[in-house]
Amino acid sequence: MARLLCFVLLCGIADFTSGLSITTPEQRIEKAKGETAYLPCKFTLSPEDQGPLDIEWLISPSDNQIVDQVIILYSGDKIYDNYYPDLKGRVHFTSNDVKSGDASINVTNLQLSDIGTYQCKVKKAPGVANKKFLLTVLVKPSGTRCFVDGSEEIGNDFKLKCEPKEGSLPLQFEWQKLSDSQTMPTPWLAEMTSPVISVKNASSEYSGTYSCTVQNRVGSDQCMLRLDVVPPSNRAGTIAGAVIGTLLALVLIGAILFCCHRKRREEKYEKEVHHDIREDVPPPKSRTSTARSYIGSNHSSLGSMSPSNMEGYSKTQYNQVPSEDFERAPQSPTLAPAKVAAPNLSRMGAVPVMIPAQSKDGSIV
């Protein structure tokens, strides 16, 4: 009975060890974004495996919306690595001779989209074997900033904050005091591993240099801050100064506006006065006045004559003297007045008057 059991065990071991097998165990791999992930896949062949060697790596993305995709393939002594666009140029076999039993690959410049399940499949008829590896890509903490939220005055309440710009969860925080006794204040001990420390009733003993370290499974980052707890400032003086400054600014603005308004009024007044002043222009000279003077003197002479002697004068016609702006109108020929003897004129009370001669065109000579 014992011999039969040993025979069965030996047969099982022989069957288990025969044929193609992948010796690398399945495992979970965690790497940081931007790093290189090494996915191992080592295999052994048996004499019975006589067919062509085919090696392929497949990926099942973490979103589970895409079926398994081939990312790199070895077949017919050739390598094909352009099947999966997201990993094109970033996946390579680590061995120059994969037939030696090493089908491991490197995935460079890891991105969050590379997260998923990778499968190594080796085929050499009649043997077939495969192993799966879970790749997780994490982001290192970076860009961490330490700052004080509040007024750093004695008796005040404020907060010390430690905030990384990026980093995959879970994140761990640790505060330390780097100056003086390097001992954290007792009220803060409960929050030494928190991203925020709440400071109550601050005292000058809290002043010093502090550091905050944040880390996750793939990396860490650190920031520092200087805390200076000072006596309260003179708020009344500050408020009074602000009020006085505001009033002075308002007065200055008012003065500027007043000056601008006054200047505009002066300019407007000067402009109106300038438009109201007109220079008197003398009227154009006319020859009509000369003619009128002659006619007036002639009428005076005729007024001293008797009605019987004015018969010749009543028929005399004078044409109107045109202005310089118009052409002179043609004149009708004038009749010579009747002659009266000098003794008759004297008896009539006439006074001798010199009458200027008149040309045919009406002008006085």
From Swiss-Prot:
Q: Where is this region: Disordered?
A: 269-315
Topological domains, Cytoplasmic: 259-365
**Tissue note:** Expressed in liver, kidney, heart, lung, and brain. In skeletal muscle is found at the neuromuscular junction. In cardiac muscle, isoform 1 and isoform 2 are found at intercalated disks.
Cellular component terms per the entry's GO annotation: acrosomal vesicle; adherens junction; apicolateral plasma membrane; basolateral plasma membrane; bicellular tight junction; cell body; cell-cell junction; cytoplasm
- Residue window of motif PDZ-binding: 360-365
One GO biological process term is: heterophilic cell-cell adhesion via plasma membrane cell adhesion molecules
Phosphoserine found at: 297, 304, 306, 323, 332, 363
Q: What domain of life?
A: Eukaryota
Ranges annotated as biased composition (Polar residues): 286-315
For the Ig-like C2-type domain, which residue ranges apply?
Answer: 20-136, 141-228
Q: Where is the signal peptide?
A: 1-19
Q: InterPro entries, alphabetically?
A: EJ_Adhesion_Regulator (IPR052307), Ig-like_dom (IPR007110), Ig-like_dom_sf (IPR036179), Ig-like_fold (IPR013783), Ig_sub (IPR003599), Ig_sub2 (IPR003598), Ig_V-set (IPR013106)
**Listed Gene3D superfamilies:** Immunoglobulins
Q: Where does the record place Basic and acidic residues bias?
A: 269-282
Q: What does the UniProt keyword field contain?
A: Cell adhesion, Cell junction, Cell membrane, Disulfide bond, Glycoprotein, Immunoglobulin domain, Lipoprotein, Membrane, Palmitate, Phosphoprotein, Receptor, Repeat, Secreted, Signal, Tight junction, Transmembrane, Transmembrane helix
One molecular function GO term is: PDZ domain binding
Function, in words? Component of the epithelial apical junction complex that may function as a homophilic cell adhesion molecule and is essential for tight junction integrity. Also involved in transepithelial migration of leukocytes through adhesive interactions with JAML a transmembrane protein of the plasma membrane of leukocytes. The interaction between both receptors also mediates the activation of gamma-delta T-cells, a subpopulation of T-cells residing in epithelia and involved in tissue homeostasis and repair.
Free-text comment about domains: The Ig-like C2-type 1 domain mediates homodimerization and interaction with JAML.
Quaternary structure and interacting proteins, as annotated: Monomer. May form homodimer. Interacts with LNX, MAGI1, DLG4, PRKCABP, TJP1 and CTNNB1. Interacts with MPDZ; recruits MPDZ to intercellular contact sites. Interacts with JAML (homodimeric form).
Put simply, this protein is called Coxsackievirus and adenovirus receptor homolog
